[in-house]
Amino acid sequence: MDSLDMQIIKNIEKEGRISHEELSKRLNLSRPAIHNRVTKLEEQGIITGYKATIDWSKLGFNTCAIISLRVRTTDYDNLLERLKNLIIPDLVIEECHIVTGTWCILMKVRCSTPLGLKAIQDDLHKIECIKESSTSLILSSLYD
């Protein structure tokens, strides 16, 4: 792994559909060299896939929030499975992380309006091991 590999990774992370030709122009390498490096990164499991970036606002999900949870459990797998299986109309759980610090779990959610957050709050408080929650609206993002 060298600095060129890292530049390839950063470009692909930002633009999953970038062509090898465009990468070769940006990095001043031949297309075969780019192809060989990308193939090697894929074979090593460093690049594991390519994904679409969704503009959630075009789907009507204009509100984005971070929900912090403090829980009382040692069975995080069971709790995460329950969170994964939550079905709430007009809500997308985009990310869910077990973290250290004051809170135990952080979730990034999207819905059409701030009032839509009430539905997930109501459902979360039905889960007995959730002790406390806090919701923060995301006003803007530097990186996404």
Name the predicted role of every residue range.
Residues 1-144:
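A compositional/biophysical signature of low hydrophobicity enriched in polar/charged and small residues
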